[in-house]
């Protein structure tokens, strides 16, 4: 199908113009439509908000005026005299005058009548007695909408019917609660007065009443009676009948529940600012119009005659009213609009609705307009846009054909000229061929029609040659090449082809630049990869060396265990066997200590964040505990060991040794504090002890015999800004170099590096504490640390000697844990070491100053010995255990040469130490009483079964039943309970086949068994302990099981006699 280019151009222009016109028309329609709708919606919302505010203010005015009446002294005095026994009419004579005076003070609100009721129903009466009926002297003649029985008109203020019954509550007393209710279940309270009405006397006048309790002026809880005030509703009707902002068809409607109290019943409450709506009950509630809707002149009736006469209808018939009641009014303007809604009669209208924000009523105010009036601007806009679109399209359709014909005229001329060049005359070449030249050449030579002979055929041949050459290049394998520049010839006229050539050359130059830049970046990345490769190889070498070292540290105690076990199997002498077993016990405890250090550090590297246990502690306790902990080790190596409170400017040992030897005087803190040794501080005492024990243990390990280890405690200043991390400076520290930041970038981020939340603390820090910077110095005369390792000793698995032939053992985690704990407490750790002269560690920690304690010579070891969890966890300790981090302590202990291993096993030990240290043994109280114990052991491992049986046998427990999983344990307990037998104690492993220990414990507890259940598990994390206790277990023993831990369980649940411990050989 051939379509002329003029037609194509015309259709293209027409379609383009129509598309642009349609886009503009649609955008204009959407924008203006939304604008018109928004303006109309905002207009309805504004009118609804204004009308609602007027009605609310009138109701508030009525409530405020009524409350001023009940506070009058004459009224309250008369009521008090009435309850005192004065029931005469003279008692209320002055009150009647006082009430008439209050009603007659005419202002913006007209008050007509008032009645006062007693506060309770007297004997023999069915409802509360009216004590006072007052009608204002200035009340106009108002005929009520009903007559006397004799047919005469009833006027407001007449005796009897002159007080409209529908405006006065029927106060009856509930026999169960002895409270007065106006209607069935409708109380009258100070926060919820009762509004009745409006009662329409004619088409333009209505009456309303407000009932509220009379509160004694001297006692807010004393109700003297109730009052009902009748007022004019003309202000409400004036606000409803005002035509401002309503247009030609707008109406103001007021919907209310079809109940006399003007509120929805319980179970069908609408939404408020603080409560959700009860949609199910609210949907079927009956509502009515407060004031009858009357059609405007010239408008059709939009409401049925029955509804307009006061009949009720379901709330769901008016969707906008139901929607606004279901919407909480949490903003200032809580009105909603719907320009395409329907009223209860099914008439399509545009409405704006708002819920009255009043404690007196639950009304909905509706601004209603006809749909035609609301969308009249939209209809005009639609007509204008359609007329513009079709009119413009018609004009374009008339103008395009001639314009297209004129526009393609040059193209047609070019086509004719091309036909002359491409279609030569058939026959031999003649000089006339020179007249057939390329039209482009004609234009370039300004009309010159002469060309070189055979120019057309030469160009044709060149074109064929280029095609052939290009075809050959396509067959060649593709290689990336940067295109070369195109030679730019001189030109007079600049056109699109000239711009294209220039842009192509710029692109080629940019490609060359980017290619060279890419080569440079590749070379740079190659160099970085080489550096990374070298670093990886170095790290791999360090890892290999660490594995070799830690393998030696782990295999050394393992070798002692296996070797001495082999000796015991071939030995018959009992004393030698006991000594060999003592060595096995010590080696096993050392192996457990090494594994605990590795596991503790691994937990710190992930998300198990350590939490501080901050509380009050005495600074002197730190010194006392350190002296007792290291007493034996210091005596064995004959090391000069001292712990002193010093002034901030006290020099190190190697500088002036004579200063250390002289007797120091009292050392005080900053002005307003106390002596250092008498200070009571706020912080985590045990984390400070853990750091110091690590540092002192490290110094004692490397210090030779007859050496010196000194601990100095100083207060170097006061922190001015406690919220920031303390970084105090001192002239005495100017020559020391901080290590905390040197390896921060090279180590992985751990949970200790994250800021600590306030919720991690177990106790609340007392307010207004002064923050002091405490400095703990640990100095030794050991070999020192080489200069090249001082930047790395605080990194994990790094030691001063990394060789395989090193003299000292250890995992290399102690100083790393110290650094982590110091950062956790917003402190810092530094070192200064010189090879051959010793090492000085300095720890600065901000602590809160609480008070000064009285001097005491006793050492406090209770906090150290009792604050950390041991191998045994009970239900009473669960609250504190779950709050304390799992790596605060472990239950494994190491045996010393001067105390029994089992007694040491119950003493505390801190993790992350170079060697295990223990507090002195606490004397064990001897148990009295004898009881035969019947025990059940649930354990799937045969070796563990044998260990438990033999350890129970050592405690004279032989009646033991062994099962291999949780299901058998449950079945065994169930069978024994059916036979009337009970177990005195149940040992429950956690990880077992078929049914684990936790689930088995839950089933046993659900069965009603109350026997003590003790968990046995090697997984001693806080989460596991908590799960065990929550399942119903009573205690928790961590594996490996220690005899003191087992004794503690037996002493608690089944007391047995305990023999005195014999010293080991």
From Swiss-Prot:
Compositional bias ranges of the Polar residues kind: 739-749
UniProt xrefs under InterPro entries: 2C_system_His_kinase (IPR050956), CheY-like_superfamily (IPR011006), HATPase_C_sf (IPR036890), His_kinase_dom (IPR005467), HisK_dim/P_dom (IPR003661), HisK_dim/P_sf (IPR036097), Sig_transdc_His_kin-like_C (IPR004358), Sig_transdc_resp-reg_receiver (IPR001789)
GO biological process: osmosensory signaling via phosphorelay pathway; p38MAPK cascade; protein phosphorylation
Region (Disordered): 719-769, 884-903
Membrane topology: Single-pass type I membrane protein
Location in the cell: Membrane
Source taxon at top rank: Eukaryota
Keyword terms: ATP-binding, Glycoprotein, Kinase, Membrane, Nucleotide-binding, Phosphoprotein, Signal, Transferase, Transmembrane, Transmembrane helix, Two-component regulatory system
Glycosylation sites: 86, 133, 150, 170, 202, 216-217, 333, 345
Residues where 4-aspartylphosphate is found: 989
Ranges of the Cytoplasmic topological domain: 405-1065
Signal peptide: 1-27
Membrane topology, Extracellular segments: 28-383
Record's keyword annotation contains Repressor: no
Functional note: Nonessential protein which may be part of a two-component regulatory system activated by changes in the extracellular environment.
PANTHER family, per database record: TWO-COMPONENT HISTIDINE KINASE, TWO-COMPONENT SYSTEM PROTEIN B
Name of this protein: Two-component system protein B
Source organism phylogeny: Eukaryota, Fungi, Dikarya, Ascomycota, Pezizomycotina
């Amino acid at each position: 199908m051939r379509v002329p280019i003029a037609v194509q151009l015309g259709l293209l222009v027409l379609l383009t113009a129509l598309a642009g016109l349609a886009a503009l028309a649609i955008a204009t329609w959407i924008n203006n439509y939304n604008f018109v709708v928004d303006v109309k919606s905002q207009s309805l919302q504004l009118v609804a908000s204004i009308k609602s505010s007027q009605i609310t203010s009138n109701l508030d005015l009525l409530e405020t005026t009524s409350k001023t009446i009940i506070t009058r002294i004459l009224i309250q005095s008369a009521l008090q005299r009435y309850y005192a026994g004065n029931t005469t009419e003279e008692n209320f004579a002055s009150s009647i005058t006082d009430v008439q005076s209050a009603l007659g003070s005419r202002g913006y609100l007209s008050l007509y009548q008032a009645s006062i009721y007693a506060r309770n129903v007297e004997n023999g009466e069915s409802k509360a007695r009216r004590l006072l009926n007052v009608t204002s002297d200035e009340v106009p003649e108002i005929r009520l909408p009903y007559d006397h029985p004799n047919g005469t008109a009833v006027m407001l203020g007449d005796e009897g019917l002159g007080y409209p019954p529908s405006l006065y509550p029927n106060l009856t007393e509930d026999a169960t609660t002895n409270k007065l209710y106006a209607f069935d279940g409708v109380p009258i309270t100070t926060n919820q007065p009762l509004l009745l009405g409006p009662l329409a006397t004619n088409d333009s006048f209505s009456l309303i009443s407000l009932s509220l309790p009379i509160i004694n002026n001297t006692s807010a809880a004393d109700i003297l009676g109730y009052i009902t005030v009748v007022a004019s509703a003309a202000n409400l009707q004036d606000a409803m009948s005002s035509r401002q902002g309503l247009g030609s068809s707008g109406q103001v409607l007021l919907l209310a529940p079809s109940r006399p109290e003007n509120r929805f019943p319980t179970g069908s409450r609408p939404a408020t600012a603080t409560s959700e709506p009860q949609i199910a009950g609210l949907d079927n509630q009956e509502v009515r119009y407060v004031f009858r809707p009357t059609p405007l002149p010239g408008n059709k009736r939009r409401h049925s005659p029955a509804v307009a006469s006061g009949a009720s209808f379901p709330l769901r018939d008016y969707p906008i009213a139901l929607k606004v009641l279901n919407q909480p009014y949490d903003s200032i303007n809580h009105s909603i609009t719907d320009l395409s809604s329907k009223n209860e009669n099914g008439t399509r209208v545009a409405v704006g609705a708002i819920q009255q924000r009043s404690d007196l009523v639950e009304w909905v105010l509706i601004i209603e307009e006809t749909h035609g009036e609301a969308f009249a601007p939209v209809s005009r806009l639609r007509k204008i846009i359609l007329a513009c679109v079709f009119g413009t399209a018609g004009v374009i359709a008339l103008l395009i054909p001639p314009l297209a014909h004129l526009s393609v005229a040059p193209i047609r001329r070019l086509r004719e000229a091309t036909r002359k060049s491409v279609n030569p005359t058939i026959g031999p070449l003649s000089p006339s061929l020179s007249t057939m030249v390329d039209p482009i050449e004609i234009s370039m030579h300004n009309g010159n029609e002469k060309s070189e002979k055979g120019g057309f055929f030469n160009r044709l041949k060149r074109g064929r040659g280029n095609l052939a050459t290009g075809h050959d290049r396509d067959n060649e394998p593709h290689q990336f090449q940067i295109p070369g520049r195109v030679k730019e010839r001189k030109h007079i006229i600049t056109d699109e082809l000239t711009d294209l050539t220039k842009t192509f050359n710029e692109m080629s130059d940019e490609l060359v630049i980017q290619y060279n830049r890419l080569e440079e970046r590749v070379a740079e990345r190659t160099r970085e990869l080489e550096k990374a490769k070298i670093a990886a190889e170095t790290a791999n070498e360090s890892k290999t060396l660490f594995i070799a070292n830690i393998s030696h540290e782990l295999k050394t105690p393992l070798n002692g265990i296996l070797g001495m076990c082999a000796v015991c199997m071939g030995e018959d002498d009992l004393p030698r066997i006991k000594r060999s077993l003592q060595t096995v016990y010590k080696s096993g405890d050392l192996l457990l200590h090494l594994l605990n250090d590795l596991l503790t550090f691994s937990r710190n590297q992930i998300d198990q964040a350590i939490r501080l246990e901050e509380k009050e502690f005495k600074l002197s306790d730190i010194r006392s505990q350190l002296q007792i902990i290291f007493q034996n080790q210091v005596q064995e190596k004959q090391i000069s060991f001292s712990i002193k409170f010093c002034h901030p400017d006290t020099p190190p040992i190697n500088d002036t040794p004579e200063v250390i030897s002289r007797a120091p005087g009292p050392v005080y803190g900053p002005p307003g504090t106390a002596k250092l040794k008498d200070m009571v501080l706020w912080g985590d005492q045990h984390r400070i002890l853990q750091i110091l024990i690590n540092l002192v243990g490290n110094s004692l390990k490397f210090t030779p015999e007859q050496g010196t280890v000194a601990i100095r405690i100083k207060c170097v200043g006061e922190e001015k800004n406690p919220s920031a991390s303390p970084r105090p400076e001192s002239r005495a520290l100017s020559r020391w170099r901080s290590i905390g930041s040197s390896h921060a970038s090279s180590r992985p981020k751990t949970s200790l590096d994250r800021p600590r939340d306030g919720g991690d603390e177990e106790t609340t820090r007392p307010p207004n504490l002064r923050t002091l910077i405490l400095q703990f110095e640990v100095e030794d005369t050991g070999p020192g640390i080489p200069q090249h390792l001082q930047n790395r000793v605080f990194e994990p698995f790094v030691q001063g000697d990394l060789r395989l032939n090193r003299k000292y053992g250890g995992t290399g985690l102690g100083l790393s844990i110290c650094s982590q704990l110091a950062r956790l407490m917003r402190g810092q750790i530094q070192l200064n070491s010189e090879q051959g002269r010793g090492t000085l560690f300095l720890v600065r920690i901000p602590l809160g100053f609480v008070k000064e304690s009285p001097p005491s010579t006793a050492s406090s070891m209770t906090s150290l010995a009792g604050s950390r969890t041991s191998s045994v966890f009970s239900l009473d300790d669960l609250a504190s255990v779950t709050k304390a981090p799992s790596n605060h302590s472990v239950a494994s202990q190491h045996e010393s040469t001067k105390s029994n291993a089992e007694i040491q096993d119950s003493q505390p030990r801190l993790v992350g130490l170079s060697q295990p240290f223990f507090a002195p043994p606490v004397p064990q109280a001897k148990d009295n009483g004898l009881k035969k114990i019947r025990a059940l052991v649930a354990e799937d491992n045969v070796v563990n079964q044998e260990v438990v049986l033999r350890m129970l046998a050592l405690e004279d427990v032989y009646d033991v039943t062994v099962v291999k999983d949780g299901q058998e344990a449950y079945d065994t307990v169930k069978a024994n309970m059916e036979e009337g037998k009970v177990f005195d104690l149940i040992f429950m492993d956690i990880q077992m086949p078929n049914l684990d220990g936790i689930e088995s414990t839950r089933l046993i507890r659900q069965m009603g068994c109350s026997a003590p259940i003790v968990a046995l598990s090697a997984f001693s994390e806080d989460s596991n302990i908590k799960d065990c206790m929550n399942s119903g277990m009573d205690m928790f023993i961590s594996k490996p099981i220690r005899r003191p831990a087992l004794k503690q369980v037996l002493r608690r649940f089944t007391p047995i006699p305990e023999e005195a411990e014999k010293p080991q050989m």
